[in-house]
Amino acid sequence: MLEKRDNRRILVIKHGALGDIVQALDAFASLRAGNPQAHIALMTSPGVLSLAKMMPWFDELIADPRAGLLNLAAAWRIRRSFRQDWSVIVDMQCSSRTRNYFAHFVPSNARWIGTASGCSDPLPDFTGVNNRDRMVTTAKMAGGVSQSPDMSWLVNGAAQTDNLAVMIDHKQYVVLIPGCSLAKPQKRWPADRFAAIGNELAARGFEIVLVGTADDREAVNAVLAALPD
């Protein structure tokens, strides 16, 4: 575990998608709880920025479009981000991309917590450990302490929608997102499970909203068919 100092500058790397960010919330809260005075920055995907801006744990956000390394302009911008005076870089993504960042963009003396070969603080063997617990352990290696996140920031966040009907009828809504990455269909939760949750919530008086991309249409329709009107 790293020594805690008020002037520490911590860079966290965690890209999207949405599910990965949700799994990281406990780790984000734990990192901030253990480093209350530190400057903590989050490097993430552009699509996550609007959500990340609402989070109470970060002082700075860095957009990483994850462009190809041969895109010299984008690569230079990311390299410059890594060349700031970071006390520690916390890799919660642990992907081939972030390992390439470590190999090519990060100063040789940088403190790096992750799985990159040769990094200063390698993570333990996480075989059989779920993503949420992996990231909490990673946060603790950067001085974090166990902390369940206070989600009031999300409840109190300003709603952004073009659907005025949603904004003015003052009903209670629950959003279900049945889709997932097409590259990993095994991650998709069964439609009947979503429908069971939707039916239970509808019975309690909530309005159910199903969202997704065009690729999620089949999953959304399956859930919709099992829900009441």
Across the structure, where does each feature detected by a protein language model lie?
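Catalytic machinery of carbohydrate-active enzymes
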Residues: 1-229
